[in-house]
Structures are given as C-alpha cells and as structure tokens.
Amino acid sequence: MTATHRGAQADASAPAGPLPPEAAAKRVAWLRDELDRHNYQYYVLDAPTIPDAEYDALFSELQALELEHPELQTPDSPTQRVGGEPLSAFDSVRHRVPMLSLNNGFADDDVLNFDRRCAQGLGRTAPAAGEQDLFSAADAVEYACELKFDGLAMSLRYEDGRLVQAATRGDGETGEDVTVNVRTIKAIPLKLRGQAPAVLEVRGEVFMYRGDFDKLNERQAEAGEKTFVNPRNAAAGSLRQLDPRITAKRPLSFFAYGLGELQGVDRPPTHSAMLDGFAALGLPVCKDRAVVKGAQGLLDFYRDIGQRRDALPYDIDGVVYKVNALAEQERLGFVSRAPRFALAHKFPAQEMTTIVEDIEVQVGRTGAITPVARLKPVFVGGVTVTNATLHNEDEIRRKDVHIGDTVIVRRAGDVIPEVVAVVTERRPDDARAFVMPTACPVCGSHIEKLEDEAIARCTGGLICAAQRKQALLHFAQRRAMDIEGLGDKLVEQLVDQGIVRTPADLFKLGVAKLAALERMADKSAANLVAAIDASRETTMNRFIFALGIRHVGEATAKDLARHFGKLDALMAADEAALLEVNDVGPVVAQSIAHFFAEPHNVEVIEQLRAAGVHWTESEPVAKAPAPLSGKTFVLTGTLPTMSREDAKELLEAAGAKVAGSVSKKTDYVVAGAEAGSKLDKAEALGVPVLDEAGMLALLAEAGAAPAQE
C-alpha cells in the first residue's frame, strides 16, 4: 500500500508496555477501524494515505494484542485474512437468487437488436430492423455500461454488515463455499462501512491485475513451481485452493457489479445508483462505467473501451449493457436462463487454440536466432495468425512445445502473437521435439550461445545476408536515418543481388539501377534516391542509433551524443569512459567498445562520412545530475505547439522518465486538448496536471534547456 503522503494519524503511536483489558479492547477497536479505513482508501478510492511500513506496523500491533487477549479476536478482524487450516473439500452452496449467465453479442447488429427488444418490451416505439437512433431523447432506453472482467464470478453474503459467506457461481443454482479463501482477499471488506442492510448479497468478479500476475509467475518460476497461463487461470486456481494459506499469498482483487438477495432496505432505483451504494459501503467498484441512452450510446462505449483495452491494468473480454432502471429490468424479466435486460458484447478473442505445424528459426539484425512456430491459421485478436514467436530454445523447453502440438496462442493489441501454453492431452503420437540448429540456416556460420544468455546467435556478422537485411532496415527506419521508401522487399532484392552489402552502399545507388528492380519504376526510383540524398544531413544521436549497436536504443544514443559531442570521441572511448555516460552500465559499455573496436565497423562509418553523411557536432557535456531525474511524467492529448514525441524528448533530456500510463507513482501528467482517461485517472489520484506552458515552466525552473539535435 504505497503512498506519497500520510493521512491524519490520531492515536497512531503504539502504547508502551502491556495494556489492561479495557484499554486493550479500545485499542483493538481503534486499530481495526484504522486498518479498515486504510484498506478502503487503497482498494476502493485508490488513494492510500500511509506507506506500507506504517500499515504493517498497525497490523502487527493488532496481531500482538489479539494474541495477548484472545477473547478480543473476532471473525471480521483484518488479522483473520491470513488463512487457517487446509480444507478436505468445498461445501456446496445453493444461491438464494440464481447467478445467471448473460446472452452474448458479437456484432453491431446484435446490439441494435438488443436495444430494439428492450424498447419493445418496455412499450416504446422501436426503430425498424437495421435502423437506430430513431428514438427521441425521452423514448431512448437508458443503459448502464460496464466492463466484462475475465475472472471468476463470486457471490458475497453480508449479514448486518459482516461477511458471512462467499460462493462461486457454479452452475448458477449451486456453487462452492469458498468463504475461508475469500476472507484472505484484502480488496474484499470483512465488514461494510456505514449503515449496512440486514442482508446484502453482492455479485462480482475475483480477478488478478496483470502486474500482480507477472510478479506471481516470477515467484513461481524462482521457486521451481508451475507458472500460470493467464491471470484468469491464476485467479481461479488461487481461489479454489484447499489450503487458504496459499490463497492468502496470491494477489487477488475484486470488483462488485451486481445484487443478489437484499433485506432491510429498499432496492435502489437504478443499477448505477446500486454501484454507487456499493462503493459507499466500502466495496471496490470499477470506475470505467457509464450511463448512456440508446444503441448508439452502447456502441460508442464499446468502441471507447475497445481502444483502451490493452492499456487497462486487467484483462477484460467485452463490455456489459444493462437496462439501468431496476423496475424496467423486472418488467423485461428473463428468457431461459438469461436476463432480457442485459447483454454481454464480446471483443474478438485474444486467446485461441491451434496446431504447431512446424518450428523454424529466424535470424535478427544482431544475429539473434529466434524460433518461430508456424501455425495452422487461426483468427485471434481480430486478425488471422499464422506465426507466433517462441523467443528462444529455453522457452521452448520450459513450455514443452513440440511440432504437432495443440497450443494456446495469444495476441493482444499490437503485441506479437505468442504461444502461451501447450494442451498436452491433445499431443499426437507423432509429435516431434524441436532441435536447435548448430549452423545458421541463412549463411551456414556457427551458432553459439553464451553461458549467461538465453539467446543463441549466428556468428556470421555482416557475412550473413539475414543480418545484413535487418541491419539495413534498421539503418533506414524513420527514427534512424529516415530513408522513406526503403522497405523489406526492396532490401531483400538489393542484398540478394549483391548490390548492397553495407549501409554505405545505399549512397552509391542510382535511378537506373533501382528502376531495373522488381516493382520499381523511374519515378519510385527517383523518389528513393532523393530520400537517400536527404538523409545525408542527420543528427549525431540518429546516426549512432542507425548503426545498430547492440543494447543501444534511442535514449542511449541521445545520452552518448550529448555526453561526447563528437563521434570520434565516442569511437575512441574505452569502457571506463563509457561508464561515465548517464544510464550506461557494464554490459552496454562493453557492447559499444566492442563495436568500435571492430575494423569493419569503423570502415563502414568512414565510408558513410565520405558519402556525405554529416551532422552538427558540439562540445561534450560533462555528466551532471539531471534536474528531473527520478520524476515520472505521462503525456496525454494534443499539445498546442509541439508533438508528444517532442515533449518526451525535452523531458527525457532533463532526466525524467516518460511512462505510458498513470499510476500512484506518476509525478506529473502533461495534458493537451482532447485528453482522455489518463487525465481522469490523474485527477482521481491527485496527480498534478500541467499544460504545455506549465511543463516548459517546470523545465525552465529546473534549468533544463531543450535538447539540441
């Protein structure tokens, strides 16, 4: 529960020495209330007010007092989350109000038809088939929209505000009693806040944040234990542990989204009001929700969430629409085992099963040998996937991937498809294990694997045509020399026909030679020659990045250019001198020194200079503390006078880190026009928000001048 500031800490200091029973009872009550309050601030408000160490001290004090005064221990105490003795089996629980599944929709027409059915069921004039938005604002049905979490459905029963039972969905009528395990989940309150109903059944989802899932798998791997395929499997497996002490160690979370049995108070008028009520009682409720009208409102919500899906910190597989008014939900009722008033609008699946037809290896720019699974085509993540990376030989062995296996393939957003697990029970008798080749499939050079590296590499260097092709593509990319028009197919022809062997050869190309190549004509050849000619004027950091030195990315290239000022100074630097550069460690320093010690590389650089490649050099900048070092910024929206990339360069030049998402660790958000959810989250977390002028003023105050290329 990391925080950047402390809240009010009345009575926070632990008393010295043993307490008499009456004082102990008061102290225990205060500690429980204080720990419950901090859990609420952390899990519901997402705004913690004390650091982890202080929370742990309060928790330890409560544990000690309950041990000293066992008569004060109660089932809803925060100390009771640690888990008790293992169970032999889970008991069955019959749901008083069934936990029904939802009908699914996959296309826009499914949503239009759902809206039409709801309107007709409520006696409103519905649009004709294939049409939408024919309602007046008064006629359109109001819906509550929320996320469809990819976790495990759960029912929590509270009596007089205290958690008495937790059960899985099961078949909807009967589930399993997992109360002892659920009590270990810190996000779920053991006691509700405020005036709680006599009976409240809360429906929601137990899930795992992606970051927590990654850390769990790291711990599992370090301990030599089985890792989990995805967060959903991890959440389900953790919750169904017979030993609650294991569950207590798993980073499970929870969001409330529905209502079961309710006694002692009236039902709220709307679904959205119900969720607000849950939050007031201390239950975690997802903030990514909206109330909309009509089919167009539903589709707009779906598309907005779809665009932000990969940036969310947890997995979802769609969105859920519910008629907002609970009275209207009752009027619409149910059909079979699903409510008429709700629809789950699914996203394209991000995981599917298919068959590994072969495993081949690809050779990268630095000689890295990467095994790639050739797959039976499968539609996943919105595209047809035929290949998936297997990363390296160790990863193949760890996942036990064989040719012929049925595997689970995952593709999320722009992420390269990967094989995440093997369905071993479907392995055919003729499945074959992968054997890493000892010679490069492109040039025949020896493949070596160093002891401290997972990746095997071709030793051929630029003798290897595959490495030459990748090196040329890297050299020409937009963020390097920016040679527009030099793509994969053209580079392949230039290398295969022996026209280009090094980047310097690009500057010898003429229109006639290029026009003779496949898919090239005089105009496109002339355009490419012009682009190559324009690239002669560049910047030192772009040139360094274009060289393709292993471990040297854009940020390191900028640091090197800024530190040395002149290329000759960089080329002459030994490892000790390189270690003086910001963020350059021993591995990177060794890689740079080895690159410039290779005569062939120096020869290519001199050929490039002779071809007219040039930049403005400057005096070296002594290493100094970066004024914004340690600060994390997030950029969102459109800035008035510069691109976000320009703003990022300014901030990074001042030592700041620029992140892609807002969290409690973010120091500033720089927001321009049409800033989206990042701005909302910053305001919710209390992160300072700057406009472009504010960012520039902060840079000026810190003495950080704009980076010079």
From Swiss-Prot:
Domain BRCT: 623-709
Pfam families the UniProt entry points to: BRCT (PF00533), DNA_ligase_aden (PF01653), DNA_ligase_OB (PF03120), DNA_ligase_ZBD (PF03119), HHH_2 (PF12826), HHH_5 (PF14520), Nlig-Ia (PF22745)
GO molecular function: DNA binding; DNA ligase (NAD+) activity; metal ion binding
Protein name (record): DNA ligase
Residues at which NAD(+) binds: D52, A53, E54, Y55, D56, S101, L102, E146, R169, E205, K322, K346
Family membership noted in the UniProt record: Belongs to the NAD-dependent DNA ligase family. LigA subfamily.
InterPro entries, A to Z: BRCT_dom, BRCT_dom_sf, DisA/LigA_HHH, DNA_ligase, DNA_ligase_AS, DNA_ligase_CS, DNAligase_adenylation, DNAligase_N
Cross-referenced PROSITE patterns: BRCT, DNA_LIGASE_N1, DNA_LIGASE_N2
Superkingdom per UniProt: Bacteria
EC nos: 6.5.1.2
A cellular-component GO term for this protein: cytosol
Residues noted as binding Zn(2+) in the record, renumbered to the chain: C440, C443, C458, C464
Co-factor(s): Mg(2+); Mn(2+)
SMART domains linked: BRCT, HhH1, LIGANc
Role description: DNA ligase that catalyzes the formation of phosphodiester linkages between 5'-phosphoryl and 3'-hydroxyl groups in double-stranded DNA using NAD as a coenzyme and as the energy source for the reaction. It is essential for DNA replication and repair of damaged DNA.
Annotated catalysed reactions: NAD(+) + (deoxyribonucleotide)n-3'-hydroxyl + 5'-phospho-(deoxyribonucleotide)m = (deoxyribonucleotide)n+m + AMP + beta-nicotinamide D-nucleotide
Region of interest: Disordered: 1-20
Gene Ontology BP term (one): DNA repair
UniProt cross-references to SUPFAM superfamilies, sorted A to Z: BRCT domain, DNA ligase/mRNA capping enzyme, catalytic domain, Nucleic acid-binding proteins, RuvA domain 2-like
Keywords: DNA damage, DNA repair, DNA replication, Ligase, Magnesium, Manganese, Metal-binding, NAD, Zinc
Gene coding for it: ligA
Keyword set includes Chloroplast: no
Active-site residue list: K148 (n6-amp-lysine intermediate)
